[in-house]
Design a protein with these regions (language model features):
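A general secondary-structure boundary signal
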Residues: 42, 52-58
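Conserved short loop/turn motifs at secondary-structure junctions
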Residues: 26-31, 59-62, 91, 121-122
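Histidine/acidic residue-rich metal-binding segments in metalloenzymes
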Residues: 35-49, 66-134
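Alpha-helical scaffold segments that flank or form the walls of functional sites
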Residues: 1-26, 34-46, 72-78
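A structural signal for isolated positions on well-ordered beta-strands in alpha/beta enzyme cores
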Residues: 24, 54-56, 116
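Active-site mouth loops of central-metabolism enzymes
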Residues: 1-6, 56-68, 88-95
């Protein structure tokens, strides 16, 4: 936690020195310990006077295809992440991709969060999750 915290604070200092006032950062919440999220939530509080830091709970390994993915996403939002993230084309099947979108939209609605979905970032023409999201 401390190493991540120190590196993030150093980066925020550099960003602020160059006029950056807002950052949206994606934190991988498929780490069951949620160590990076814990560190960045501390950084957000410590650096609030310097920069507006928005934290995305991002399921880098998927929500439905990763063991405990739904629980980790829910826990991340309950801990204080600002935005619900998603990456449906990383799920093992199309059905799981669709299910992950339904889950993340419901989670965001229940907690009043914004949504940040990395959608169809692939060369596969059959990856059409944007249609589901819309």
């Amino acid at each position: 936690v401390e190493d991540t915290r120190q590196r993030a604070l150093k980066t925020i200092g550099m960003l602020r020195d160059n006029g950056v006032q807002h950052v949206r950062t994606h934190i991988d919440v498929t780490d069951p310990s949620l160590t990076a999220l814990e560190a960045m939530l501390r950084v957000k509080k410590e650096a609030a006077h310097l920069i507006d830091l928005q934290i995305v709970a991002f399921p880098q390994e998927g929500i439905e295809s990763f063991p405990g993915g739904r629980e980790l996403m829910t826990r991340a939002i309950e801990m204080g992440a600002d935005v619900v993230g998603g990456i449906p084309h990383y799920e093992n099947t199309r059905d799981k991709g669709v299910s992950s979108l339904v889950f993340l939209m419901d989670l965001a609605e229940r907690h009043g969060c914004l949504v940040d979905v990395h959608c169809d970032e692939t060369d596969d023409p059959q990856s059409r999750f944007l249609e589901v999201l819309a």
